[in-house]
């Protein structure tokens, strides 16, 4: 049995959120393959980790906060991580960026200390991640808006392996615009099922 941490990051209400619909459908399929796994869902909008941001005013104490320790320990205690990753203004939600800031701590989750080549050594090697991306534009419209690649890179930096990212793209233009979030997810259901099977 695996422990699976699921991070909700959307800034929208659940009933209109494409990333919530995608995450729910993924979990539905995942449970078919892994019925005994423990699922832990955390809504970063409702947790301090999603609202405590790194600024010049907070930088001196940011990494000493209990919330930082809590989430590093949580990452070390689970086997799998599911990240709902919608795009807002060509980037990740601020809640997800704040989470990544909180758990990216030198000598806790990554290190250069023992590297022979001077590159980073990720210290969270117990985890496999599944990124579930959503964006309004079709894939390739805005090459600078590669939000899922940023999250993949951040996971790799921390030593986390990941399954092939699932991306639901083009939700704000026809033909997907006219559909409900659940109907949009059905347009990529084969990818969702395959990700659930291999995760």
Curated annotation (Swiss-Prot):
Cofactor: record remark: Binds 1 FMN per subunit.
**Enzyme's top EC category:** oxidoreductase
Q: What domain of life?
A: Bacteria
Give the required cofactors. Answer: FMN
- What molecular functions are annotated in GO for this chain? electron transfer activity; FMN binding; oxidoreductase activity, acting on NAD(P)H as acceptor; oxidoreductase activity, acting on NAD(P)H, quinone or similar compound as acceptor
Q: Which family does it belong to?
A: Belongs to the azoreductase type 1 family.
What UniProt keywords apply to this chain's record, in alphabetical order?
Answer: Flavoprotein, FMN, NAD, Oxidoreductase
Q: Which NCBIfam families match?
A: PRK01355.1 (NF002370)
Q: How does it assemble?
A: Homodimer.
Q: What is this protein called?
A: FMN-dependent NADH:quinone oxidoreductase
Q: Is this entry keyworded Magnesium? A: no
The answer to whether UniProt assigns keyword Ribonucleoprotein to this entry is: no
| Record-linked InterPro entries | Flavodoxin_fold (IPR003680), Flavoprotein-like_sf (IPR029039), FMN-dep_NADH:Q_OxRdtase_AzoR1 (IPR050104), NADH:quinone_OxRdtase_FMN_depd (IPR023048)
- The protein's Enzyme Commission number: 1.6.5.-, 1.7.1.17
């Amino acid at each position: 049995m695996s422990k699976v941490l699921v991070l909700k990051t959307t800034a929208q209400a659940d009933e209109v959120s494409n990333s919530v619909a995608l995450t729910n459908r993924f979990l539905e399929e995942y449970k078919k393959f892994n019925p005994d796994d423990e699922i832990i869902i955390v809504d970063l909008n409702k947790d301090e980790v999603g609202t405590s941001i790194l600024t010049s005013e907070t930088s001196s104490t940011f990494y000493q906060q209990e919330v930082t320790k809590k989430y590093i320990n949580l990452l070390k205690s689970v086997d799998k991580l599911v990240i709902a990753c919608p795009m807002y203004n060509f980037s990740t939600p601020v809640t997800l960026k704040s989470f990544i800031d909180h758990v990216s701590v030198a000598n806790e989750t990554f290190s250069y200390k023992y590297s022979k080549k001077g590159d980073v050594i990720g210290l969270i090697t117990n985890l496999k991640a599944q990124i579930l991306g959503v964006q309004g534009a079709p894939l390739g419209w805005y090459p600078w808006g590669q939000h899922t690649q940023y999250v993949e890179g951040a996971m790799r930096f921390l030593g986390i392996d990941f399954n092939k990212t699932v991306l639901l793209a083009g939700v704000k233009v026809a033909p997907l615009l006219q559909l409900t979030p659940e109907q949009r997810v059905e347009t990529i259901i084969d990818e969702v099922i395959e990700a659930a099977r291999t995760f």
